[in-house]
């Protein structure tokens, strides 16, 4: 889709693939094609597990549903809507995860023997793409924050030096952001790459929300990057393994499609494609409001965690104008070593003892991934009331309750209060545990949703 089409602002209320599947479902077509479960009839256990609605639209490519390898109707329309929503010249629906998106991006830019400038902390999919195409990496080694033990972004002078020393490189690749939410100066790096006649590629596996959030770091397309791989399933709400590849006006979409078709399946999942279609519509219509709330939730959690002491939930205070040019405020990263626990230990405690599954834990940090799905009863924003402790059973809590140390929540905002939780709180109080978090320091009352 060309630039003028992008500016027309298509009707983002549409979801062409979803609409086509709904029409197809109503046609009651008799299946003598694949998949062999025949709309679930051939595998009742699978149907019972996933549901008839799901297996009923797990179908093969056909004329009314278009073909992912050569889209001409509803898939093409869905890609045009995605490009419009993300401010790209063209968008490709990807069903092999962002790994396939990243690899297609690199294979488009690089041939055997070409050099590509990239940070050392790239995802393995980038390096696997270099193995496939025979391109040569030129590494930029980002600095490491000594206290937190995390890699930062690429400094402008590091990228400038790499471009100067490798003038024949064909592209510069940037993480936008890193796993921990660290962003490089993307606009400056794009300009340096373009001034040197190179493409700028962005791995935005963790940056879908940048396209829909005021106050968040700049997105790759807004910064002028040539290609970006976007994990819609991470923070955008689509199904796992669904992704987007976005390109700018300087990259030929026909060639990109050829590259994608070298490795992507010829049996594109309509479950994944429809999830991309529906999720794009949701983001286009409601994403800005939702991600503003997500950022507010993360900031509230940072303040509460840092008030406990011992833990350090880091944020925009890390920004230094260069190696940490910006920070993704939706990321809730917490440094744990100061309380004598490795991040992986806190990860295990949260999962095994509290049934809380966070994204990961490393040697010194944990990461809780907040996204479009983290709006538990609007707990941070809804009206609240204070009730005596024992009268809160069955209510939704609107504040933290924790013993310190270790400072791990017994109750968190948005969590329903059970009898067992109340028993535990009273037991901990009776044993003299230091209780923190609630507005009432004696925890005789709790704030709940009104």
Predicted ranges, named:
Residues 55-97:
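Conserved N-terminal alpha-helix of the aminotransferase class I/II PLP-enzyme fold
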Residues 90-116, 129:
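Conserved beta-loop-alpha segment that forms the PLP phosphate-binding cup at the N-terminus of a helix
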Residues 279-302:
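Structural signature of PLP-dependent enzymes
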Residues 1-73, 404:
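N-terminal "arm"/small-domain region of PLP-dependent enzymes with the aminotransferase-like
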Residues 219-258, 264-275:
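Active-site PLP attachment segment
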Residues 148-209:
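Active-site phosphate-binding strand-loop segment of PLP-dependent enzymes
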Residues 303-416, 423-437:
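Conserved C-terminal alpha-helix-loop-beta "cap" of PLP-dependent enzymes
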Residues 114-174:
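PLP-dependent aminotransferase-like
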């Amino acid at each position: 889709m060309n630039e003028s089409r992008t500016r027309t602002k298509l009707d983002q209320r549409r979801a062409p693939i979803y609409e086509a599947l709904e029409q197809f479902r109503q046609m009651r077509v008799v299946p003598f094609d694949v998949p062999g479960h025949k709309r679930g009839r051939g595998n009742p256990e699978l149907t019972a597990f996933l549901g008839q609605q799901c297996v009923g639209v797990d179908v093969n490519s056909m004329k009314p549903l278009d073909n992912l390898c050569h889209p001409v109707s509803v898939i093409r329309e869905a890609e045009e809507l995605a490009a419009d929503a993300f401010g790209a010249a063209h968008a490709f629906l990807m069903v092999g995860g962002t790994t396939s998106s990243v690899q297609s991006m690199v294979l488009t830019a690089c041939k055997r023997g070409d050099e590509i400038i990239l940070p050392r902390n790239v995802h393995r999919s980038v390096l696997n793409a270099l193995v496939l195409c025979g391109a040569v990496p030129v590494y930029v080694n980002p600095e490491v924050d000594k206290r937190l033990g995390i890699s930062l972004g690429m400094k402008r002078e590091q990228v400038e030096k790499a471009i100067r020393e490798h003038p024949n490189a064909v592209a510069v690749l940037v993480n936008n952001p890193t796993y921990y939410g660290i962003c490089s100066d993307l606009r400056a790096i794009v300009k340096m790459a373009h001034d040197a006649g190179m493409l700028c590629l962005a791995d935005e596996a963790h940056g879908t929300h940048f396209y829909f959030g005021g106050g968040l770091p700049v997105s790759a397309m807004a910064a002028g990057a040539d290609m970006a791989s976007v994990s819609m399933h991470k923070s955008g709400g689509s199904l796992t393994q669904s992704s987007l590849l976005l390109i700018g006006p300087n990259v030929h979409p026909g060639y990109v499609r050829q590259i994608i078709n070298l490795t992507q399946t010829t049996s594109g999942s309509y479950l994944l494609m429809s999830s991309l279609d529906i999720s794009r519509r949701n983001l286009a219509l409601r994403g800005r409001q939702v991600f503003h709330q997500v950022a507010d939730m993360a900031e509230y959690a940072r303040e509460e965690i840092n008030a406990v002491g011992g833990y350090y939930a880091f944020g925009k205070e890390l920004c230094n104008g260069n190696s940490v040019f910006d920070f993704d405020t939706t990321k809730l990263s917490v440094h744990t070593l100061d309380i004598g626990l490795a991040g992986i230990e806190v990860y295990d405690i949260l999962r095994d003892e509290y049934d809380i599954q966070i994204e990961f834990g490393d040697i010194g940090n944990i990461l809780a991934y907040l996204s479009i799905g983290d709006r538990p009863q609007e707990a941070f924003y809804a009206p609240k009331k204070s009730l005596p402790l024992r009268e809160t059973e069955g209510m939704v809590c609107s504040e933290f309750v924790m013993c310190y140390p270790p400072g791990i929540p017994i109750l968190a905002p948005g969590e329903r209060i059970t009898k067992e939780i109340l028993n535990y709180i009273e037991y901990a109080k009776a044993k003299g545990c230091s209780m923190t978090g609630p507005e009432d320091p004696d925890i005789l009352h709790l704030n709940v949703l009104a």
